[in-house]
Amino acid sequence: MASIEAVGAREILDSRGNPTVEVEVLLDDNSFARAAVPSGASTGAFEAVELRDGGDRYLGKGVAKAVEGVIQTIAPAIEGLAADDQRLVDQTMLELDGTPNKGKLGANAILGVSLAVARAAADSAELPLYRYVGGPNAHLLPVPMMNILNGGSHADSNVDVQEFMIAPIGAPTFREALRSGAEVYHALKSVLKKKGLATGLGDEGGFAPNLDSNRAALDLIAEAVSAAGLTLGKDIALAMDVAASEFYKDGSYAFEGGTKTAEQMTAYYADLVASYPIVSIEDPLDEEDWAGWKALTDELGSKIQIVGDDLFVTNVERLQRGITGGQANALLVKVNQIGSLTETLDSVELAHRNGYRCMMSHRSGETEDTTIADLAVATNCGQIKTGAPARSERVAKYNQLLRIEDELGDAARYSGASAFPRYAG
């Protein structure tokens, strides 16, 4: 296999106009690849460290130090290594960093190199990335969990829940699922306009109107599904990312104008699940409310998918704690939360081995990089969260999945309703 000949990096902009890291890798057989790193708005306290420069430049958000770390520290250490030994490349970087949270070199530097090396190795092997990482069994196209209505940290509105998503569960193929989702998205815009509500967009391409309640958001989406000529619960299911850590303070949740305990939040979710075809709730409670998560999982885990994002931060140790303790039944997979491809794949493997579902995810600050689309197929996640069917940094991932589905031909299978406990039988 080809070895790594040169590694370069630069500062580029993400979809929010903030700097991020882009890495380029050249192998000695002239194979070449680049990768760009995403960045989150609502970040878990236990995520790997994203190195930012501070100071006045880019309001303190520059990544010149991370870029310098790639060029001056990481590159000399990995040049000459076999590009197909991903674990060795990643381990070399982790040892160079030497901290538990990648605080020295930065997860943004390490991840950029990790993904670019994988892409270059795939190029050298003359394989698409999903096949290179996932092998011959990588054939499952994910359900697109489309965030079409935004609140919380992703929007300037008075809606507590960060994301209201649609899941096109009734489609026979990914291509048809994408069409269904896009049609509901456009129908929602018309519904909002008709009601005199704002149609401005949040970070991830979803609409961000001011609404009276979180239930009102679900009702609007239900109306849009109907207006698109589709059936709620059959063609389209609903999902939410609550991001509850964002409104948790002093042991209670500041929610819908009052405060709620974990027990009251659980009762609230149970009522929603009984009223709407909700298949998945992400981060329903605070990232350190392990007892609350256990009670909520006991109550709702057999009915719906309960996803740990801030709870697990794609970290095998925190995920193992949840598996042992009975918290959640699914893992949200964000490559930049943990900061290397190897560690990401280890987390997915641990989840799958223990019967936890997985959802591949973007971040709110994205680029045109499509790596996560390939990784969703490579890992047979069956679900991907990469925003609304709008804004090119979101659509880039959907378009890559269309290409993968075409390339797989008859071998392609769309995950559909079987991805979720509510419909899996």
From Swiss-Prot:
Annotated (2R)-2-phosphoglycerate binding sites: 162, 334, 363-364, 385
Q: Active site: which residues? A: 204 (proton donor), 334 (proton acceptor)
**Can the keyword Lyase be found in this entry's annotation?**
yes
Localization per record: Cytoplasm; Secreted; Cell surface
Q: Which SUPFAM superfamilies match?
A: Enolase C-terminal domain-like, Enolase N-terminal domain-like
Name its GO BP terms in alphabetical order: glycolytic process
Q: Known NCBIfam families for this protein? A: eno
Q: What does this protein do?
A: Catalyzes the reversible conversion of 2-phosphoglycerate (2-PG) into phosphoenolpyruvate (PEP). It is essential for the degradation of carbohydrates via glycolysis.
The protein's name: Enolase
Organism the protein comes from: Nocardioides sp. (strain ATCC BAA-499 / JS614)
